[in-house]
UniProtKB/Swiss-Prot annotation:
Gene Ontology biological process terms, A to Z: ribosomal small subunit biogenesis; rRNA processing
Domain PRC barrel: 100-176
Gene name in the database record: rimM
Family: Belongs to the RimM family.
Keywords noted in UniProt: Chaperone, Cytoplasm, Ribosome biogenesis, rRNA processing
Record GO cellular component, one term: cytoplasm
Binding partners and assembly: Binds ribosomal protein uS19.
SUPFAM superfamilies associated with the record: PRC-barrel domain, Translation proteins
Organism this protein belongs to: Prochlorococcus marinus (strain MIT 9215)
InterPro entries, sorted: PRC_barrel-like_sf (IPR011033), PRC_RimM (IPR056792), RimM (IPR011961), RimM_N (IPR002676), RimM_N_sf (IPR036976), Transl_B-barrel_sf (IPR009000)
A Pfam match: RimM
The protein's name: Ribosome maturation factor RimM
């Protein structure tokens, strides 16, 4: 999620990899170089301020949106275990500039979800998460029954994204919201 004040979460450490301190990272970013190119990064444990750490190396796991990275001074599996659920952040002033109609996928989180019925907007839920293993899916929590549904993030189903006004309009195929 984008914090307008300072930080953008670009990854989440999910587990260890091997015995030498490498960690697996679920990418929340379209920019793979954030996990491949050595340099300074920021880690954040829940409810604590971010701390600087150096990325030594990284590689993408084949067929996944998961990366394995090596961080400076993290040299054992035990130490790597302590980083589970830490967020990897970048400063918002380091976010690449986008074209007028573009947005960062993480900006979709917490947007209201509307359908258009008989020329009337009907708010049905909100975006609570993204899944992007192979294709981008919006995880939407429906207000009427508190169920979570997965909506493919494609133009045919999500024709309108209005970041400025905090909503999207979806056009789901029949039955998709009832699954």
């Amino acid at each position: 999620m984008i914090n307008k004040n300072k930080w953008l979460t670009v990854g989440l450490i999910t587990s260890c990899h091997g015995i030498n301190g490498q960690v697996k990272v679920k990418s929340l970013s379209d920019f793979e170089e954030r996990f491949l190119k050595p340099g300074m990064r920021w880690l954040q444990k829940e409810d604590e301020p971010p701390s600087k750490i150096e990325l030594i190396s990284g590689f993408k796991q084949p067929g996944k949106q998961t990366f394995v990275i090596k961080l400076k001074d993290i040299n054992s599996r035990n130490h790597a275990e302590q980083l589970k659920k830490f967020k990897i952040l970048v400063k918002t002033n380091e976010i690449p500039k986008l074209k007028k109609e573009e947005f960062h996928l993480l900006e979709l989180i917490n947007l209201k979800v509307n359908t258009l019925e008989n020329d009337k907007l009907n708010t049905i839920g909100k975006v609570i998460n993204l899944e992007n293993e192979k294709n981008n899916l919006l995880v939407i929590k429906l207000f009427k029954n508190q169920k979570e549904v997965f909506i493919p993030f494609v133009k045919e189903i999500v024709p309108i994204v209005d970041i400025k006004n905090n909503f999207i309009i979806i056009n789901p195929p029949n039955g998709l919201l009832e699954l």
